[in-house]
């Protein structure tokens, strides 16, 4: 089994993406396809009976485009492709996730931040358990306890995590392409450089901001224009309607 990083992860953006601007699903799928071919080329003696492909959430959307690409490239001839909870309309999905950070949460005020609220709950949770065990089942077990997060708190947590993801993508894409939106183009960055000022600036940019400032200009420059609605159709499952049917 081979597990690929998401095209939105900083390692994939920096090492495997041709344009270092994830968000145009067809381009992301082509990058993933090249990585898959490279992995196979590095293991020429590994016997393979059949190829299967699966993806979850954004990965499911990417998997659909990779499978469609393979219909013409015929490099893998996937026997089965499993799409788990793919976003039908990518723009609608990211817009909804962007809005979660605006959720009103009871208990948050000028003296108590959301992070303090969550940390206090985690502290009480571990005190009641009597030990600290960080594992894959932590969130499920925590949500079954008396300290569980409410729907509003969970929405805020998801929204906050999503905002950080957007910031990492925006920073990495801007830095590699020298666009100067977050990091000055000629600003020297070394191992000892503090990235805090750039993180603060990147956190002001949600996914809609990243789409507007980086994805759309890059896409228009490569396709001689096009409207936002055209891009939305091209990056969502709508583009594969005939293929999926």
Positions of the model-derived regions?
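Conserved alpha/beta-hydrolase
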Residues: 1-15
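Active-site catalytic pocket residues across diverse enzymes, especially alpha/beta-hydrolases
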Residues: 43, 70-74
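C-terminal subdomain of alpha/beta-hydrolase-fold enzymes, centered on the catalytic histidine
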Residues: 172-245
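Alpha/beta-hydrolase-fold enzymes
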Residues: 74-198
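Alpha/beta-hydrolase active-site loop
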Residues: 21-43
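Gly/Ala-rich beta-loop-alpha elbow adjacent to hydrolase catalytic centers
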Residues: 54-63
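Active-site signature of alpha/beta-hydrolase-fold catalytic machinery across serine-
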Residues: 65-69
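Alpha/beta-hydrolase-fold catalytic nucleophile elbow
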Residues: 5, 54, 82-85
